[in-house]
Amino acid sequence: MRLLAGWLCLSLASVWLARRMWTLRSPLTRSLYVNMTSGPGGPAAAAGGRKENHQWYVCNREKLCESLQAVFVQSYLDQGTQIFLNNSIEKSGWLFIQLYHSFVSSVFSLFMSRTSINGLLGRGSMFVFSPDQFQRLLKINPDWKTHRLLDLGAGDGEVTKIMSPHFEEIYATELSETMIWQLQKKKYRVLGINEWQKTGFQYDVISCLNLLDRCDQPLTLLKDIRSVLEPTRGRVILALVLPFHPYVENVGGKWDKPSEILEIKGQNWEEQVNSLPEVFRKAGFVIEAFTRLPYLCEGDMYNDYYVLDDAVFVLKPV
């Protein structure tokens, strides 16, 4: 009887998903049609032209306060970024894999977060900076090496991999169990979210990349980072999507407001950057350098890739 009931439930779910995926008004159906009918010069190939991509790095320095003008580092579309874009565009054209990912995402979104689904499927990798951009921002050479890195909210570890050649020991934290699995496959030492503050040692570099707007207590997080950072040569590399829209992701894709609010003001990228020195000062940091970079994510059937505007800072303790 239980087997029959389970079979009926599965059948009903399959019918519902099929109707959802293949209705003539469905974005999935339209995307499939575009993939089948467009050639190499069609909409998918045309997405994200070179001229548009260069706009990702533009900063109006005249709108920055004087102290920030002095530490701004101009970045550019480089080879490492272009390789990520090319790979993402290629993957988005793998039609049957994208169909499979879409089906699995539809089913698993009922009881898993989008982050965990991506970790399970091994898709949706993020890109914050290339090796060259990382080195220019920290003012280090390719051979520079130090002892200990902590990457908070490391996701699948692809960004960690870019930083890892410069460190002898690499630690990471992550909430998603499937992302932890991805990190462990890369041989990184995964610490619990309440463990990294209590290891008894300090970190030479702590990365906090696009995490402050997705955690419940961003102010507490900044202060915890300060408490375990090596006090003289230690640095924090912190990325933040601007304009700032904080929320906390829960199972089923539900969004909640964080319990702590960062006082970030302004309507555009430059105005919001101007309010951040005071936010960092309250946590015990000053800005040593910063840049504007695209926060990229691998695409799917609908887009070759996704992009948001990042401000990436190097912070030093005071």
Swiss-Prot record:
Which residues hold S-adenosyl-L-homocysteine?
E174, N210, Y295
What range does the record give for the signal peptide?
A: 1-18
Q: Which organism is it from?
A: Bos taurus
Functionally, this protein is described as follows: Protein-histidine N-methyltransferase that specifically catalyzes 1-methylhistidine (pros-methylhistidine) methylation of target proteins. Specifically methylates the second His of proteins with a His-x-His (HxH) motif (where 'x' is preferably a small amino acid), while exploiting the first one as a recognition signature. Catalyzes methylation of target proteins such as S100A9, NDUFB3, SLC39A5, SLC39A7, ARMC6 and DNAJB12; 1-methylhistidine modification may affect the binding of zinc and other metals to its target proteins.
Where do the record's glycosylation annotations fall on this chain? Answer: N35
- GO annotations of cellular component type: endoplasmic reticulum; mitochondrion
Q: Return the InterPro entries for the record.
A: METL9, SAM-dependent_MTases_sf
> GO molecular function terms here?
protein-L-histidine N-pros-methyltransferase activity
Q: Which SUPFAM superfamilies match?
A: S-adenosyl-L-methionine-dependent methyltransferases
Going by the record, the broad EC class of this enzyme is transferase
Alphabetical keyword list = Endoplasmic reticulum, Glycoprotein, Methyltransferase, Mitochondrion, Signal, Transferase
The EC code for this enzyme is: 2.1.1.-
One example of a Gene Ontology biological process annotation: methylation
Location of the protein in the cell: Endoplasmic reticulum; Mitochondrion
Q: Name the reaction it catalyses.
A: L-histidyl-[protein] + S-adenosyl-L-methionine = N(pros)-methyl-L-histidyl-[protein] + S-adenosyl-L-homocysteine + H(+)
**What family is reported?**
Belongs to the METTL9 family.
Its name, as the record gives it, is Protein-L-histidine N-pros-methyltransferase
